[in-house]
Amino acid sequence: MKYSGRTATAIIEFPADMILLIKRETVPFRGYWALPGGRSERGETVEQTIIREVKEETGLEVEVVRKIGEYHEEGIQDKVEYDYYPACFLVKVIGGEMQKQIGEIQDLKLFSLQNIPENLAFVHNQMIKDYSSSRES
């Protein structure tokens, strides 16, 4: 099976240099930590995608602050081939209540930027590095 297409990923910033990561329940990268996000639906902008995906996965309502970057990620993980073109956005919480999506997410957890887990899915480590660099400039 091959997954491909346009995706959107969110860095949800919290006080004290914390960001929200999800632990994936689905392949590829089952059991890995990841930034919230997912595939765009037909006719949806990447900005609309990230607002929808964050709500589905975390229960939080967000608005886009700015784009962090555009990426390409491809490979094989868990016997699943993937070829994605994600846009990564910084978003801020404007409502909702944090709760994980049953069946898709194993866990939700806040991590400090100095204590990000090593087992990150896709190219999310690079996205977090780019976000950190953009905060310092």
Where are these regions (language model features)?
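Conserved Nudix-box catalytic region and its N-terminal flanking loop in Nudix hydrolases
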Residues: 18-56
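A short coil-to-beta-strand element that immediately follows conserved catalytic motifs
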Residues: 60-70
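NUDIX/MutT-family hydrolases
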Residues: 90, 99-131
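Short, charged/polar surface micro-motifs in flexible loops or helix N-caps
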Residues: 13-18, 28-29, 41, 70-74, ...
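Active-site-adjacent beta-strand/loop module that shapes the phosphate/pyrophosphate-binding cleft
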Residues: 72-97, 127-131
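A generic structural micro-feature
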Residues: 2-4, 32, 79-85, 102-105
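Conserved N-terminal beta-strand and adjoining loop/helix that marks the start
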Residues: 1-19, 86, 90
